[in-house]
Regions:
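N-terminal FAD-binding dinucleotide-binding subdomain shared by FAD-dependent oxidases/monooxygenases
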Residues: 1-326
Length: 326
């Protein structure tokens, strides 16, 4: 009962806890079955298999709903077909124009260097309306680059902009960045950061040949999707492997070069044709602050998490194929 919960009565709070947990199992099982481990499944239809009216009605429905449905529950070719993606991006551009009063500001807010869904999707409520406020001003640093931080704020090419508070949002060095910050050294004094210089190579996104007992959870080449759900499986799989090693009185876990090459090739093959892998973003390992991370690379397993689990489970069933325990 909403009134009870809003009134914060003991009874209402306790009832809300019971109600919210009543379908946990169903939700978790649904997430296990979808490619991205969300509650949404890709629509099997393609963008141009429906009429324009049907397409617009479908998109309006997705746009009005909360959550990742517009990204994870869209037409099946939305992230692989350029024309389909451009059409979806144009639909969203019109939504931005309708919500932002100043046409010039609206145009600045419409992405020009990537299509919808090829970078992390913003889940917002009232974000675009923020730019209709008198005390909010948008500066496009592509048109007016930042030059330096000064005592009163920031300096751009054209002016000094004063601030009371400056919040840094410079991005993050994702996928491989955390591993490269550590001086990880394997057999034969092999450095991981040097070994991955041209892109990561792994076995299942878990092991790297000649780096024994280094277990990676949620790093490159692992199952892409809802990290809370995918991380759970990754940790459980690695835990089972460690338990297997202990039970068999082994001390070192390594993978074979052949297994690593096979898996990496599989990841590369699955990533071909995915529009997101052509775009510079954290998901493709691009960090504009680092000179050696300017070009997008295929960093993630994109075959869907159910397929990833099936592959890893089969490796386990076969006595940990391509994994050497000594």
């Amino acid at each position: 009962n909403i009134e009870e919960i809003l009134n914060s009565t003991h009874k209402g709070v306790e009832a809300s806890k019971i109600i919210s947990k009543s379908n946990y199992g169903e939700i978790l099982e649904l997430c296990r079955q979808t490619a991205g481990c969300y509650i949404h499944s890709t629509d099997p239809r393609k963008t141009f298999e429906v009429t324009e009216q049907e397409r617009l009605e479908f998109w309006e429905k997705l746009y009005a709903e909360p959550g990742f449905g517009i990204w994870q529950g869209n037409f099946s070719d939305m992230l692989t077909d350029r024309t389909a993606n451009a059409l979806m991006s144009a639909f969203l551009a019109e939504k931005i124009r309708s919500r932002v009063n100043d046409p010039a500001v609206a145009e600045r807010l419409i992405p020009k260097d990537h299509g919808f869904g090829t970078r992390r999707v913003p889940q917002e409520t009232g974000y675009y309306e923020t730019f209709n406020r008198d005390n909010v001003h948008l500066v496009d640093i592509n048109e007016n680059p930042l030059r330096e931080i000064i005592e009163s704020g920031v300096r751009t090419d054209s002016s000094d902009i004063p601030f009371d508070v400056l919040i840094y949002a410079t991005g993050f060095d994702a996928i491989t960045g955390a591993f490269e910050r550590i001086d990880i050294e394997g057999l034969g004094a092999k450095k991981l950061r040097e070994f991955w210089q041209d892109g990561p190579v792994t076995y299942l996104g878990v092991l790297v040949a000649d780096f024994p007992n280094m277990f990676i959870c949620m790093g490159p080449h692992s199952g892409l999707g809802n990290y809370t759900r995918t991380a759970e499986y990754s940790v459980e799989w690695v835990s089972d492997l460690i338990e297997y090693v202990v039970e068999n009185q082994k001390a070192r876990v390594n993978t074979t070069e052949a297994g690593m090459d096979e898996w990496t090739s599989h990841v590369m093959s699955l990533g071909e044709g995915l529009l997101a892998n052509e775009i510079g973003s954290w998901m493709t390992g691009v960090n504009r602050n680092l000179a050696d991370k300017q070009k997008p690379k295929i960093m993630r397993y994109s075959g869907g998490h159910p397929a990833y689990r099936e592959f890893c489970d089969k490796v386990k069933e076969e006595g940990y194929r391509n994994i050497v325990c000594t």
